Amino acid sequence: MEHKEVVLLLLLFLKSGQGEPLDDYVNTKGASLFSITKKQLGAGSIEECAAKCEEEEEFTCRSFQYHSKEQQCVIMAENRKSSIVFRMRDVVLFEKKVYLSECKTGNGKNYRGTMSKTRTGITCQKWSSTSPHRPTFSPATHPSEGLEENYCRNPDNDGQGPWCYTTDPEERFDYCDIPECEDECMHCSGENYDGKISKTMSGLECQAWDSQSPHAHGYIPSKFPNKNLKKNYCRNPDGEPRPWCFTTDPNKRWELCDIPRCTTPPPSSGPTYQCLKGTGENYRGDVAVTVSGHTCHGWSAQTPHTHNRTPENFPCKNLDENYCRNPDGEKAPWCYTTNSQVRWEYCKIPSCESSPVSTEPLDPTAPPELTPVVQECYHGDGQSYRGTSSTTTTGKKCQSWSSMTPHWHEKTPENFPNAGLTMNYCRNPDADKGPWCFTTDPSVRWEYCNLKKCSGTEGSVAAPPPVAQLPDAETPSEEDCMFGNGKGYRGKKATTVTGTPCQEWAAQEPHSHRIFTPETNPRAGLEKNYCRNPDGDVGGPWCYTTNPRKLFDYCDVPQCAASSFDCGKPQVEPKKCPGRVVGGCVAYPHSWPWQISLRTRLGMHFCGGTLISPEWVLTAAHCLEKSSRPSFYKVILGAHREVHLEPHVQEIEVSKMFSEPARADIALLKLSSPAIITDKVIPACLPSPNYVVADRTECFITGWGETQGTYGAGLLKEARLPVIENKVCNRYEFLNGTVKTTELCAGHLAGGTDSCQGDSGGPLVCFEKDKYILQGVTSWGLGCARPNKPGVYVRVSRFVTWIEGVMRNN
């Protein structure tokens, strides 16, 4: 079991007047190192702890960890390369980048990696050894040069780079083949480029990645923490031939950057395989036929298809002959075909796994009405929780339990076979206080999940007040319950889980503290001795205690229960099936309670739509081309079947229709009477104005549309689809520049999953923190579930101001 008794860390990264010394460190919240050589010291801030690490003389300090509540600093000789990282509450681990790096900058004078062989493959002699060669440079004579073990170093500032004495008596020394760091040049296609060039090839200034002006985009730094999207520096997050950026020119959306190639060989990309492992980026076999039997054409060829996935543009991807490869982060190896009518297809590569996981759709004979529904709450400490939640209290996506990226760990399905470690679902394999997961953010090792305890009354329906959105964890709330991690909790709980009274935040007895006071945190609600969470602790609200032997402890503040009328919160947890709308996944009945069926007054279903308030439905404007008279239409709510409607459905006529004035494919319908909000009829939430969904965000479409002969016709179906950034969607091989900024793409480029005729106007919803938000209205596509032709949806966030104005004035 991983140790986790120490406490969450202050999330303040204060700026130092001398610069930003913490830039020299990689930080990971919720992580600790097993260390033998260490010192435990007091420190009032993270910077003070970093200074102690720099000043240490008894050993080389490679890392430190800081415990904010105790103001405790532990400096260590080890880092993740030499020790085990484990999960711990209330701590942040800082590791010096220079000791994690296996590349050199300039002549490698500051190289502190672990390469220990020369360029000819001879093992290096230890710097402290005198055999077989008596050294001129040793740890004793040059203590500040990092002459540890037998690692390659450059103590004499040699222009040719790091070197070492060799273990060959005939060869006194030789140079080491250390790759260049990608801060001034790039290896391969610049996927790991970390430099500061911020102009394009034509000299245009780059737009900052965290800006949506002048170009709105889906490459949001907080959603892609491992892509290093800093400031406005050129980067390559999506498999282009080289780094690029969005430009500050409103007339030029994006352009490649001119980054020079490094002159040294690139770092090793790891083992290669003759079979499919993961997404096949390291597949090096000789399959050259696609899934439908088309022959692949050579990567160097430009007929019958012109393209830029060439050996020159992707020099590290082994684009040999016409073999299937995955040079750009697709879901599997693929190739361009020799068929002029089929530009490219995925290849069928044998799996490296002895028993590959089936990707067939669920059993079509399983009666959907009888399918058990997993409740999204947990009992006790959550060890028995087997739901499908995969989001933390701060909205981070969970890392798969079988994955070692970005966090290496031992909580695997093999090591914990009875813990239900499926996919990336929240679990509690080690008897913690509640379900948790490792996160996909490299700087945050783990967090608790955004789940509440079961109350015993889950699923009960209260009388429906007006629709209202719940606040998030940051919104101050005076209720004696909390949202998320309770950072906005402003209730009056003032005792810990053990019943000990809390110390007042302004008091310095019995515990003296400097960081969490009303003066230093004036907006954190540090009144009297009430439980609070000023540092965003994953454990929730806490306080310093009045027990002189116990510095602090957590408070027992429950999660606020969601009511049946909260937008975006279904009473039946959706299946979240990876199956297909075309090819099928029948939804759990009433798990998408905002889905409506738009019908003629005679009852024929022809379009979908989304309930966004008791009186208003959002749909596609082209769905209203049948008639300009509202009386022609009616709306069915709460249905699971397209025909033979259930007795509880609501049938309401349309009283008014409003099409978007600039002719976007979006329209509002006002119902003749408000819908009755029940456990089967709940509105979806609207997004913030102009919000942009991040690239590769997994969202869901629903509908009763054409299923092309597959099972489930006539029942509400669902599919999980990734959002595709417009920059990618508008490539020549996909939708070739036809997608507007007021639209978004979603779908699997292999085809097979899409919305079809009859799904038009229906919702594309994305889960954010604790609710589903309507991000798209199904609009158009080229065919139905065709390869390379993802579906196109109206981007709802661009029309929120119009939507709210129409609703307010009518």
UniProtKB/Swiss-Prot annotation:
GO terms for molecular function: endopeptidase activity; serine-type endopeptidase activity; signaling receptor binding. It comes from Macaca mulatta (Rhesus macaque). GO terms for biological process: blood coagulation; fibrinolysis; proteolysis; tissue remodeling. Residues 20-98 form the PAN domain. Glycans are attached at T365. GO terms for cellular component: extracellular space. Residues 103-181, 184-262, 275-352, 377-454, 481-560 form the Kringle domain. It catalyses: Preferential cleavage: Lys-|-Xaa > Arg-|-Xaa, higher selectivity than trypsin. Converts fibrin into soluble products. It is found in: Secreted. This is Plasminogen. Belongs to the peptidase S1 family. Plasminogen subfamily. L-lysine binds at T136, D158, R172, D432, R445. The active site is at H622 (charge relay system), D665 (charge relay system), S760 (charge relay system). The record marks R134, T136 as: Interacts with fibrin. Plasmin dissolves the fibrin of blood clots and acts as a proteolytic factor in a variety of other processes including embryonic development, tissue remodeling, tumor invasion, and inflammation. In ovulation, weakens the walls of the Graafian follicle. It activates the urokinase-type plasminogen activator, collagenases and several complement zymogens, such as C1, C4 and C5. Cleavage of fibronectin and laminin leads to cell detachment and apoptosis. Also cleaves fibrin, thrombospondin and von Willebrand factor. Its role in tissue remodeling and tumor invasion may be modulated by CSPG4.
